[in-house]
A protein has these predicted regions:
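Short S/T/G/P-rich N-terminal loop/turn motif that feeds into the first structured element of a domain
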Residues: 1-35, 39-45, 53-57, 77-83
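Conserved short beta-strand edge segments in small beta-sheet-based binding/regulatory domains
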Residues: 67-79
Length: 83
């Protein structure tokens, strides 16, 4: 299943988020897959498209970042595209 993850950087933590990312990467547990991401123009929120069959893996991943970021994790319904 795919999920949209809204990350909101805690006040004053944006630089620390990127520093940790450079040092440790995304720190995703096996079974949680990053697909793509977009940064809001003001740079305070990031929207990440992710995929997993085990949504409980989000608990492990968010615990590694929760001191710097708050999360909203939204399950997505996949539908057939009609262009």
């Amino acid at each position: 299943m795919k999920y949209m993850v809204l990350e909101t950087f805690r006040p004053g933590c944006k630089a620390r988020v990127y520093e940790r990312f450079r040092e440790k990467g995304r720190m995703l547990p096996d079974g949680l897959r990053y697909i793509d991401s977009w940064l809001e123009k003001d740079g305070h929120r990031c929207f990440q498209l992710m995929e997993t069959d085990a949504p409980e893996l989000f608990d492990q991943w968010t615990a590694a970042w929760s001191d710097l970021v708050s999360f909203e994790i939204i399950p997505l319904e996949e539908r057939e595209r009609q262009d």
